[in-house]
Amino acid sequence: MNTDKKSDLLSVLSVANVMEHIRYSVAACQTDSSNPIDRRGMRANTERILSMIDSAVAGAAPFLPVRLIVFPEFAHSAPVFPTAAELHEKLAITIPNEHTERLQQKAREHDVYIQSGSMLESDPKYPGHVFNATCLIGPSGILYKYRKVNTWIPYEVHTSPHDLPDYNEPLFPVADTPIGRLGCAICYDWLFPEAMRQLAMNGAEILIRVSAYMDPWGATDPMDWWTVINRARAIENMAYVVASNQGASLKFYPPYSWPGGSQVVDFDGRLLAQASPGPGERIVVAPVDISALRHERESRRGHHMLSHLRSEAYPTYKAHQYPPSLSNEPPSYETNNTRIDEAKKHFAQRSKTDIS
């Protein structure tokens, strides 16, 4: 073979490697575990999560292998105490920790990526504050940490990182991995299309939902906000959605019941897989085709909302709606309600001004 032909062949092979088709299965796992009231109690939940990872991998092994496994909000720990001080004292942990280390070992064992269930996080940089956090963990370790931006107020008393005046970390991180570009948001975040749009604009191809979505808004008629939101966000952002919902029974997580219904949705809003509604452990698996998604994003001209967005047409986003925190103190039920009242007054005044 002459030098020119050999060079051409190497070029073709190089392009083929770059264009390698990325297709695999994802698993949305929902848990039904007791609610720990201390750090020691978290270990049993983590052990069950590790076992479910083994099951997800084994179940898909004869078919399209699983490469991404997602767990729900509160899978490790939940805000069972009414104040940030109690959560900080009894449940909050720093990241990384023994749980993320165990997950990394499992990710390395199976060559998978794991979106952890959420855990209550403390950080010495922000004394007294507690975050609702989840990590994307791969064989090499933690790829990003996401802290819930839109906390479920007034009840949730963990801190939104957005509210800390000296916070300088990315609010919506995205990880570029061999299985695609992944980004995550937690539960109530998903009712704000702006959050998912920011992840997509940051490059996310799979939008991961770590959630504890309760009745009556959950995964069943007549409301079924769960499915409506998941499908809408997939369509709006031309992205896959892997949504893991809490499947705990009422006795574990009162005062709400948890409808499960974990889902996988494709970038056109098609429901690829869904767990049956109702409490209980479930693992739902579906294929995702990142190469097909990239082709659509590159070639599609119609219904390409990411590129058609006229962001400057929406000046409402230049001003605050929900008021910024005026204190560096952790939130409480009372201060959350005060800020909600202020935000509602601001909205009413602003609406009248805009109409006139």
Kindly label every feature range from the protein language model.
Residues 6-68, 208:
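N-terminal active-site segment of His-dependent metallophosphoesterases
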Residues 43-50, 54-139, 143-145, 154, ...:
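Cys-nucleophile CN-hydrolase/nitrilase-fold catalytic domain and related Cys-dependent amidase chemistry
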Residues 30-32, 72, 147, 210-211, ...:
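Residue-level recognition of beta-strand->loop/alpha-helix junctions
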Residues 98-114, 181, 187-284:
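CN hydrolase (nitrilase-like) catalytic-core segments centered on the catalytic cysteine
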Residues 9-13, 99, 170, 226-229:
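Alpha-helical scaffolding within the catalytic cores
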Residues 26, 128, 132-144, 261-273:
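Short, glycine-anchored, charge-dense loop/turn motifs used at functional sites
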Residues 2, 8-9, 236, 245-356:
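C-terminal beta-strand edge segments of enzyme domains
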Residues 122-206, 210-232, 298:
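Active-site catalytic loop in hydrolytic enzyme cores
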